[in-house]
Amino acid sequence: MQFKVLAVAVLASLPLVAAAQSSVTVYGVMDAAIAKEDTGAPGGSRTVTNSGNQSSSRLGFKGSEDLGNGLKAIFNIEAGVALDTGATDSALFGRRAVVGLSGAFGNVTIGREYTPIADVAKETDVLGQGFYGSNLSAFTSGRLTRRISNSVNYKSNSLSGFRFGGAYATGETSTGPSLNLMGVMVDYTLGGLYLGAGYHTFERLATGDDKELIIGAGYKFGPFEVKGNYMEADPVGANNQFKQYNLGGAYTVDAHKFFANFQTNKLENGAKGNAFTLAYQYSLSKRTNVYTSYASLRNNANGVFGLNSAGTNVTPPATAPGSDPMALSLGIRHTF
């Protein structure tokens, strides 16, 4: 009888053991704001309700399964959400969709993933790739590549402060521009110091290679932090080279956080635009904050650069070079 009772107890516990070896987490960001935006061109002023002025609104699922001996299976799918309309991105899980393995060797994933350059850009933007005038504008304008589909990706664990990463993505075509991406990154962290660099090349079958580059740094000391980066895109063709410089700082005291960032954009054809951003965040709790931001951009006679936040784009039309965009927002962000 004792044996039967013990056997029943062991069998009853098996599902609990299996459940303990795997986990799934639901997470997200809900960010909405009222904004006054002006492209600087005639008729370009508007008042809007935006989703994602500080951080892109999203809903994600991530999980892992313990396979034993330090090896885990991992996955992550993440969808963009527009709180102003309730719509999702054109690709449901277009923000991230990967599956892979994690262990002492690092992480290997397959699917739609952030690029090596995007990892460094995120770490070296004091605005957190949110707010108008962040370095996100280099990606949302299509000049640099933030995410890549059909990719195989590797990221090492920290090795005495160093991390290494690489990605290869197939264009999935045998004729015409293939756009196979090969990318690498390396970064170093020591206390409050961060240094990083990344490089991409897009292999085209006929016309040559597009190239992208980032070098960035950051330092946090007490309530202060300073971050900056240099990004470059050199696509095939004449007068197409793009350069962006960012330098910003932030100061945190109690529930208050203040941001300032300066950005310069340049094209090889002589177009230039300088952007300046001021932002303020007040934390109501660990997961909820309200914020306000102001940004302005001054284009030269050839410039049509814009102010891009995580959720919107304030860019003059190509027919109105020299226009000066401006944006002001007031919003709330909740994370879970």
Residue locations for each model-derived region?
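Gram-negative bacterial Sec-dependent N-terminal signal peptides
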Residues: 1-21
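Outer-membrane beta-barrel architecture
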Residues: 9, 60-62, 98-100, 153-155, ...
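Outer membrane beta-barrel
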Residues: 21-36, 46-171, 178-180, 187-191, ...
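Outer-envelope beta-barrel architecture signal
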Residues: 22-26, 65, 69-73, 104-108, ...
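Transmembrane beta-strands of outer-membrane beta-barrel proteins
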Residues: 27-33, 76-78, 111-113, 165-169, ...
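Transmembrane beta-barrel outer-membrane domains
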Residues: 50-54, 90-94, 143-147, 175-181, ...
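Detector for outer-membrane/organellar transmembrane beta-barrel domains
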Residues: 181-282, 295-296
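Outer-membrane beta-barrel "beta-signal"
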Residues: 322-336
